């Protein structure tokens, strides 16, 4: 089945053929305490750690996480590296060593000056997911019962917003 893009000013209707092989691989968030962040993204949201890379000379570590849904992830380092950088929808957490003990915070983009906004997870049952998040003590930025219907926002340990949606509830979203 071919994909027909929505028509909007600025959209290229026929991208170069070579781009058909491109993959949106990952987005990166800076984190202060990798233990807290890894716990949040693995225990609360179910992501798996694909790869950790340490850079002694730069004093930072990278953690690559994804939803694997039972996929076989290669054990061999070179194969795992290719798997990590060849798949879609990876979250990279970057930890600059020593940042966990300083008083500064990373800017989440949702206060002035605005910029980055959020990442999003789709869940099969929005109400059940939100009840589970409450039980786990997750911070809600926007609970289900406030504002726009059928969407919730939680925040991770660094204050980044995570949107939670249920695809089957959003067919009419944005249709006036």
Swiss-Prot record:
Q: Name one GO biological process term.
A: methylglyoxal catabolic process to D-lactate via S-lactoyl-glutathione
Which cofactors does this gene product need? Ni(2+); Zn(2+)
Where on this chain does Ni(2+) bind?
26, 92, 118, 163
What does the record say about how the cofactor binds?
A: Binds 1 nickel or zinc ion per subunit.
Its UniProt entry gives the catalysed reaction(s) as: (R)-S-lactoylglutathione = methylglyoxal + glutathione
Q: Which residues bind substrate?
A: 30, 96, 114, 118
Q: What pathway annotation does it carry? A: Secondary metabolite metabolism; methylglyoxal degradation; (R)-lactate from methylglyoxal: step 1/2
Which SUPFAM superfamilies does this entry report, sorted A to Z? Answer: Glyoxalase/Bleomycin resistance protein/Dihydroxybiphenyl dioxygenase
Catalytic residues, chain numbering: 163
Give all residue intervals belonging to the VOC domain: 23-167
Question: What is this enzyme's EC?
Answer: 4.4.1.5
Q: Which GO terms describe its molecular function?
A: lactoylglutathione lyase activity; zinc ion binding
InterPro entries hit by this protein? Glyas_Bleomycin-R_OHBP_Dase (IPR029068), Glyas_Fos-R_dOase_dom (IPR004360), Glyoxalase_1 (IPR004361), Glyoxalase_1_CS (IPR018146), VOC (IPR037523)
Keywords carried by this UniProt record:
Lyase, Metal-binding, Nickel, Zinc
Which major enzyme category is it?
Answer: lyase
Question: Which domain of life does this protein belong to?
Answer: Bacteria
The entry describes its oligomerization and partners as:
Monomer.
Its biological purpose is as follows:
Catalyzes the conversion of hemimercaptal, formed from methylglyoxal and glutathione, to S-lactoylglutathione.
Report the sequence similarity comment from the record. Belongs to the glyoxalase I family.
Instruction: Report the protein name in the record.
Output: Lactoylglutathione lyase
| UniProt organism field | Pseudomonas aeruginosa (strain ATCC 15692 / DSM 22644 / CIP 104116 / JCM 14847 / LMG 12228 / 1C / PRS 101 / PAO1)
Q: What is the lineage of its organism?
A: Bacteria, Pseudomonadati, Pseudomonadota, Gammaproteobacteria, Pseudomonadales
Gene transcribed to yield this protein: gloA
């Amino acid at each position: 089945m071919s994909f027909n893009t929505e028509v909007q000013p600025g959209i290229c209707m026929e991208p170069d053929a070579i781009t058909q092989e491109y993959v949106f691989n990952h987005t990166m968030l800076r984190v202060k305490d990798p233990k807290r962040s890894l716990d949040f993204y693995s225990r609360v949201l179910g992501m798996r750690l694909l790869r950790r890379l340490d850079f002694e000379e730069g004093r930072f570590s990278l953690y690559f996480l994804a939803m694997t849904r039972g996929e076989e992830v290669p054990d061999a380092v070179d194969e795992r590296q290719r798997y990590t950088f060849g798949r879609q929808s990876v979250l990279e957490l970057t930890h600059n060593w020593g940042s966990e003990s300083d008083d500064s915070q990373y800017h989440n983009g949702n206060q002035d000056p605005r910029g980055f906004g959020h990442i999003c997870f789709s869940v099969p049952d929005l109400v059940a997911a939100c009840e589970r998040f409450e039980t786990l003590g997750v911070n809600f930025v926007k609970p289900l019962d406030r504002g726009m219907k059928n969407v919730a926002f939680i925040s991770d340990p660094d204050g980044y917003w995570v949107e939670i949606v249920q695809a089957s509830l959003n067919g009419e979203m944005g249709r006036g």
